[in-house]
Amino acid sequence: MAPNTAVEVQSVGGIPTAVAGPDVHRDITVKWFLLGAVGYFLIVGIVALIIAAKFVWPDFLGSIQYFTYGRMRPLHVNGMLFGWLLGADMGLAYYIVPRLCGVRLWSEKLGVATSILWNIIILSAVVTLLGGYQKGLEYADLPTPVAILVVIAWVMFGVNIFATIATRKYKQMYVSTWYLMGTILWTAFVYLTGNFATLLTTGVNQANLNWMYTHNAVGLIFTPAGLAVGYYFIPRASNTPLYNHKLSMIGFWSLAFVYVWTGAHHMLHGPISQWLQTNLDRLFGHVADPGLGGGLQLHRHHERPVASVQRQRLAQVPDVGNGVLSAHVLSGSDAQPALGERDRLQDRLDSRARAHGGDGHLLIHCHGRRVLCDSANL
């Protein structure tokens, strides 16, 4: 088959979903989100400098009501959360998931529409927060109408990502896909709690819900998204296999079941239920599990030596673009694996080879041996 010949890709259910070829991933949505995120990071960084200057010169821009500290700080916090961090995470999810699934993004138009709505949300936040319209809750300052727009945008994002995963070419899912799915589900729960449930109560209960939201905004939104990005790009950039996929999944489930309880540490020894403080004490030590597991993964896979001949082959084997996956055992000889071995190898590629995604070549472990795999447009 010619290198640039397009091949129809079938979904899990046998439904044609994409054409595997040089231009299988258009990445229009990715560019919109990432460019916007970088732009907001620079702008909000300037806001941070103005806020810092106010600590030294309290009267700096103090005569302008829109630039008072009480309005600038919520703008900085929410700008970094939604404009920079969450916008960048969404853009990277649009990049990673189609490549790990071997198909195009389910709907590029829906992705672009989500990006447009996201920018409308950021601009609305700027106008309302500087205008003094806010709820006065940490991380949940946005007025309710703007918060509703965030929910709508997140539903659009989640539908696009989950639909892409549902039409994936590969049955098994790499850990980055798990973390991104978790991010979508956990964000929905955390955001609804912090921005809407807090409005239904007052006093200590409201404070408890608010700190649950602020803490888990870091641990159940940005942490899993960051781990997904690291698990994808670090093995791919270093061209070495993931150390242990099961270990990464232990970290995933630890994050899922443990982290949500630890938000109460913001009110430790305060007027909250004793049982909540007790659970916090017992579970807090396990918060480090996902980070330690990820750190061990990304450290240990660098310790695996790759023979110089393997490195030379990695550099010399040309890219292929025909959508066909082939394998060559890198041993002392050039012997090819038997046909049955190739079939078993291809069945085992989905969970680990997807770590490197993209076109090029994948270095993985199979049956205790290093294997070089040609992979096109995955």
Model-flagged regions — what are they?
Residues 30-56, 69-103, 108-132, 144-164, ...:
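Hydrophobic cores of alpha-helical transmembrane segments in multi-pass integral membrane proteins
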Residues 19-35, 167-175:
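N-terminal juxtamembrane segment and adjoining first transmembrane helix
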Residues 1-30, 61-64, 301-308:
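Extramembrane terminal tails and long inter-domain/linker segments of multi-pass membrane proteins
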Residues 299-311, 345-346, 373-378:
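Alpha-helical transmembrane segments
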Residues 136-147, 172-176, 205-213, 272-283, ...:
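Non-cytosolic membrane-interface motifs at loop->transmembrane helix junctions
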Residues 169-174, 206-210, 237-248, 275-276, ...:
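Hydrophobic, small-residue-rich membrane helices and short re-entrant helix-turn-helix hairpins
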Residues 26, 71-73, 307-310, 349:
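Helix-boundary and loop/linker segments of multi-pass membrane transporters
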